[in-house]
Each structure stands twice: as structure tokens, then as C-alpha cells.
Amino acid sequence: MMEPFERIDIQELPLSVPTFRHQVEDFLGSNGLRLEEVDLYLAALDGDGAILAGGGLQRDIIKCIAVSESARSLGLSVPLISRLISAAAERGYANVKVFTKPENRRVFESLGFHVLATAPQAILMENGRGLEDYCSYLRGFHAVGVIIMNANPFTLGHRYLVEQAASVISGDSPRRRPRKLIIIPVKEERSRFPYIARLEMIRQGSKGLATVVEGSDYQISAATFPTYFLKDLSDAAETQMRLDIDLFGRHIAPALGATKRFVGSEPTDPLTARYNALMKEMLPSYGVEVVEIPRLSDADGAISASWVRASLASGDFASASALIPESSRPNLMTYLAVRALQKELEAPMKPGLVGPDSNGAHQDMDYALMLRSIDAIRPFFPHMAMAGTPEELRQLGIDAEQAMLEATGGVNTHRGAIFALGLALNASGDSERMAALAAQICGETITPGARQMALSGYKDLFDTWLPFYRSVKDDTYGLQKTLLKIMSGLDDTCVVHRVGPVRAQEVKAEAGALLETFSAESLKETCGRYAAEGVSPGGAADMLALTIFMESLLH
């Protein structure tokens, strides 16, 4: 016999606990659903702990809603959904979206939700004015044609698509092109390059050809691409594409007055090819023509952002830069700079330094703090690469340092790296230009060791550290050995500040000796000893990151 309603409890089931996760997966599976990524899962339980109804929340999206067949007469949907809405509000989301099966439409309408888009097996709803407000914003622009792009990153292929689209819709009035073609960037933060970087690359790369508007949660996002409610992933993909296209035809295109949607052809990716085919099938009923532009190709095939990402991942900037317009270069260099900082941080067994395995000699720093610091200074790197004067570069460095201190609660985590990488970004890795820039911007806030290295154009890096790093790059302990090589030759003011000049010279000698007779056991022993003693070669860590960056940039 079913439990009385008053004895049924709604509570969180922590999915990090395997027992609860398996219970939720089994419950959803018995209701024809599958568990998707959620931040919170709430369930109504009977007296024996069995799930009668459940639902998840990911940011502002309600998903994975199900009620067991035996409990469908108990009216559990409304209190469960109300709890999820309250949980979203507590997290700062006043506007909540939901994906559900069409048969659940009335339940959600009774709670103030309205339909945004439909597909045969799903509907997308929300309870606020999010889409209405975004469409109101779009009505401030007028377009004949629309391109929606991720640009992860913006390549010559993207530029070609924009050029061809502008040519199609502008006819003999090239001066009116930007007013007739609108580009909507994908806003979802699931790409190698963050939204703000992709937005800037699109704006710079399409200047004079199109108007770039702000992206939203309503096109190609977690909000329009649900995959939680069907087991068959190919069916789920079909459903999410239909929802996305329906929302564009119902709302986005009319708000802009657009009658054309431009896409690039897709010779290799079946999912994107199917998306293009569905657009051609669905959008004409909304008065929107789909224009497919053949992809730009070179001798190796169609130019794609995935090629660029693969080259960057392997540290091959030259190959990546051959596939992008000059306007994307600062953000690609930024990616390599951030990658270098992350590689240095992620390396374990670094004597006295913070890593994934230890805080080293630091009481005020840990791995999470260093990650926050990297995130805080990242937005300044593209501007450093583009800075037109030494004064502008210097001010950007000051601003980046302030952002770092705000993110870390006043802890100096990356001051030296900001200075060195800023010079390298602006000079594109050219030693003489780095030295010239350093001579113009070095001030009293720059430590003597960092100043001397910069004024030399980082001679030791080019003459010694970079060749050494390349020689051990495939070694299991290549990063640690390169760090020891740097430590053995660098007058590290961080070490001097912590343990004095005499001990600092001894640390240099110890690093050289450890490198000569290297073993993992000796390295581990040194890590423990330096942590206890307070030795932290922070300057060497900055130079290791710079070495990694330069190797990628000059590869």
C-alpha cells in the first residue's frame, strides 16, 4: 500500500555517493530516462527510501523529471518542481527553464511556465522573461541574414563564411553589409576558448562585414540541447536539434526580421550535417531560407577549428596560426600562455612549489588558489599582446596584478609570470623586442632578478633553458628536470627573500647536483626538505612557465 502523502519526504540525493547515484539511474531508467549532468537532484521518498518522484537542476535548468507509475496519483510533481524552482532561486536564478515530455506541459503551465519550443518528443519551457528580454534586445538590430557560430577559435574558414554570406545578401551595396548580416556567438562556456574571447575574435574577424550581437542561452546551449530524457543518443540529438531550430524559427529570426540563415557545409561531422539538413527541412515553414556555403579548404581538406585546437594542444603555434586571421592571433597566444601556466602548476614533485600533490613551502597558497589566479589574469593577456605602447603594456600589467590580488585575497601568486608573459606576448617571443620593451617599462616594482633577465632579452632562456626543455620534453620528469636546470642557474629573488643569499646559492648548487644524479627518490626527498625549510623557487616557476610558452610559440 502506498505511503500517505504527509509521510513522503522530498530530499537531496547526493550523486557523488555511488549508492545514491545508482539508485537515481535505476529510477530514471525504469521511467525511460537517463541521468544527465546536474548540480542537484531532489527526490520524493517513501518510508522505505524508495524514489517515488525525482528531478534535477543544472544551473537554471530543471531536468531528469520523473514520477514512478505507482505514485502518479499522489500529486508529487507540483511540490517537487516547486522545490526545484526554490533551489534555483537560492542559487540566484530567477528565470528557470525546463525540458520535459509533451504530456507534462499542463503541470508546468500550472506553475507559471510557458512553451518556448517544441519537438515531437520534448518541449522547452521557462517561467520568466528571459527569451522575451533577449528578443527585445535583438529587435534593436535588423538583419536579412544570420550566422550562429561557436568560433572555437575563429579561423580563416569562419572568415570565409562571413565574407560569402555578406556577399550574398548585400548585392551591390557593400557599405550596408554590416547592417544586413548578424552573427550570434554561442555563449555556452564549454569550449576551449571562453565566450568573451570568442566574442572578441568574431568581432575583430568580421569587422566591416557583419554586426556581432551578444549570445544567449537560447541557441546551441545547455538550454536548447537537452539529452537527458532519451536513452538513444542519436534520438536525443535529433530531438535537441529540432528544439533549437524551432526556437530560432519561432523567436530569434522574427526578432531580427531575418529571412536567411547561413551555414557552412559539413563534409566530415555527421551530427552537424544532420543539423544542416534539419534546418533546411524546418526553417522554410517560418519564412527562413537556409543557405549552405561550401567550406573553405586547403590541400589537407576543409579548414576547421578542430585542426587549430589540435595544433595548439600539441604546442604547434605555427601550424595553428596558418589557419587563422591575424585578428585571432592574440587569443591563440593567450591560450598558449594559460596552457603554460597550467602545465607548470599541474606538474607534481616541484621542490618548494605548489602543485596538485603539495602546497610546497607555502602556508598561504594551494592548488585551487593558483587556478583562481590564472583565471583572474587570463583576460588581460590578449590585450597585452595587442598593446600599442610600452605605457599601455605596463598599465595592463598593473591591472592584471590587481585582479590577481583580488582573486587571491592579497597573495602574490603570479606577479613574475604576468611581467614575463606580458613581454613575451607583446613581442611575439622575439628576444630583442622583449629586451627593448623591458628597458622602457621596468620600474621599481619589478624585482632586480626579473628586471635583469628581461633586460637581457631572457638570454638564459633562449641559450640554455629552451634547448634543454626540448631535449627532455618526452621524459616522464621533463618538467621537473627543466625546473632544476632553471634553478641551478637563476638568481631567484624569491629564494633569497625567504632564506637569505647564502642559502639561495646553496639551493642553486643542490638543484644542479640533483639534476646530475637525478632520481625520483632524491627529488621527493628534496621536495619534503624544501617544504619544511621554507625554500620556494617562485622565480624559477615563472621561468618554467615562460619556457613552456616560448617552446609552443616558436615550435
Range-by-range predicted roles:
Residues 73-86, 157-163:
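Conserved acetyl-CoA-binding loop-helix of GNAT-fold acetyltransferases
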Residues 88-100:
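Conserved GNAT acetyl-CoA-binding A-motif
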Residues 333-395, 399, 415, 427-528, ...:
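Phosphate-rich cofactor/ligand-interacting catalytic cores and adjacent structured alpha/beta frameworks
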Residues 100-333:
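Nucleotidyltransferase catalytic core that binds NTPs
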Residues 1-34, 46:
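Short amphipathic alpha-helix that is part of the acyltransferase structural core
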Residues 408-425, 534-549:
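Conserved phosphate/anionic-ligand binding catalytic regions in large, soluble enzymes, centered on
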